[in-house]
Swiss-Prot record:
Family: Belongs to the ATPase A chain family.
SUPFAM superfamilies, per database record: F1F0 ATP synthase subunit A (SSF81336)
Record-linked PROSITE patterns: ATPASE_A
Species the sequence originates in: Anaplasma phagocytophilum (strain HZ)
Assembly description: F-type ATPases have 2 components, CF(1) - the catalytic core - and CF(0) - the membrane proton channel. CF(1) has five subunits: alpha(3), beta(3), gamma(1), delta(1), epsilon(1). CF(0) has three main subunits: a(1), b(2) and c(9-12). The alpha and beta chains form an alternating ring which encloses part of the gamma chain. CF(1) is attached to CF(0) by a central stalk formed by the gamma and epsilon chains, while a peripheral stalk is formed by the delta and b chains.
Designated name of the protein: ATP synthase subunit a
Length: 242
């Protein structure tokens, strides 16, 4: 089996639509729904208090995640950005759940597909743009022309800044998808190699796979962290401005 077979999108339910549209329910959609449910269940479990007053593992985990999100927003967008904690927290939990679920046996990594990560990135960047105009009006356009820019350099600076702004969702999407694809592919290749080895020689590569899986879990958390931090950095343009 090809190492890339794990990323194949499979139709689970055909939904006929006119004009050649295809909105069939796929394994990718199924695991995105599962990731959303896992995030919701984790939050619900964290809100429940134990009778003895002690904190559960889910409560501790969510508290750590919440503190990270608050810290990231305060560091990049300032106190004014704290009203958007639910949005940023939802982004982090969804990306993290998608990444982790993809590592599990029979799992599917929705964030390995650029279509999914690009949709997430467009939502983030579009939201930032709308919030920017909502908070600052037309003054939001100042992000394309830094204060003190010489007049002769202004057209080039506006072009560069506009290009960089429009490239944000693409760079966010490709970074996340590429890292998910790379890690899962390496594990699949080595796992297939181990299966073909003599049983006497298999334990060492098998142990190496376990190390790679642990590293992949770290990468899954790291990529969710990076995606969230960049979201708060972009949010700072809307809330704080330049």
């Amino acid at each position: 089996m090809s190492p890339l077979e794990q990323f194949k999108v499979v139709r689970l339910l055909e939904i006929p639509m006119p004009f050649g549209m295809d909105i069939s329910f796929t394994n990718c959609a199924l695991f995105m729904i599962l990731a959303s449910l896992v995030s919701a269940v984790l939050l619900c479990c964290a809100l429940r208090k134990r009778t003895d007053g002690s904190s559960s593992m889910s409560h501790t985990a969510v508290e750590l995640i919440y503190n990270f999100v608050v810290g990231a927003i305060e560091s990049n967008a300032g106190v004014g950005g704290l009203r958007y904690i639910p949005f940023v927290l939802s982004i982090f939990l969804f990306v993290l759940a998608c990444n982790i679920i993809g590592i599990l046996p029979l799992g599917f990594t929705a964030t390995s597909h650029v279509s999914v990560t690009l949709a997430l990135s467009v939502v983030v960047c579009a939201s930032v743009t709308v919030l920017g105009f909502n908070h600052q009006g037309l003054h939001f356009l100042r992000i394309f022309l830094p204060e003190g820019t010489p007049l002769w350099l202004a057209p080039m600076m506006v072009f560069i800044k506009l290009f960089a702004y429009l490239a944000r969702p693409v760079s966010l999407a490709i970074r996340l998808a590429a890292n998910m694809i790379a890690g899962h592919t390496i594990i699949a290749v080595i796992a297939e190699f181990v299966l073909k080895m003599h049983p006497v020689l298999a334990p060492l590569p098998f142990a190496f796979i376990m190390v790679l899986i642990a590293f992949e879990i770290f990468v899954a958390i790291l990529q969710a962290y990076i995606f969230t931090v960049l979201t708060t950095v972009y949010l700072s343009d809307a809330v704080a401005g330049h």
